[in-house]
Amino acid sequence: MFVKTGDKVKVIAGSEKGKEGTVLSVNVKKNRVVVKGVNMIKKATKASASNANGGVVETEGSIHASNVKVIAKAESNKD
């Protein structure tokens, strides 16, 4: 896959078009990436020992790898 964890990418298609961020994770089987600060989704969580109140938590959702363009490679990925 052309995108690796740590790369700086720009979203080129979809509702988040134009946003930039760092790749947090890559799912090679599904060809999807999670970009920091892009495609934020809200999840309802129940109260638990680690989260006493529960409530709504915002996390990054995955987007298809074809919708991103690499702007800068991560230092560890430069070949």
UniProtKB/Swiss-Prot annotation:
Which GO BP terms sit in this record? translation
Q: Which UniProt keywords apply?
A: Ribonucleoprotein, Ribosomal protein, RNA-binding, rRNA-binding
Molecular function per GO? rRNA binding; structural constituent of ribosome
* CDD domains (UniProt xref): KOW_RPL26
- Cite the Pfam families for this sequence: KOW, ribosomal_L24
Q: Which GO terms describe its cellular component?
A: ribonucleoprotein complex; ribosome
What is the role of this chain?
A: One of two assembly initiator proteins, it binds directly to the 5'-end of the 23S rRNA, where it nucleates assembly of the 50S subunit.
Family classification: Belongs to the universal ribosomal protein uL24 family.
The protein's assembly and partners: Part of the 50S ribosomal subunit.
From the Swiss-Prot or TrEMBL record, give the protein name.
Large ribosomal subunit protein uL24
User: What phylogenetic lineage does the species belong to?
Assistant: Bacteria, Bacillati, Bacillota, Bacilli, Lactobacillales
Encoding gene, per UniProt annotation: rplX
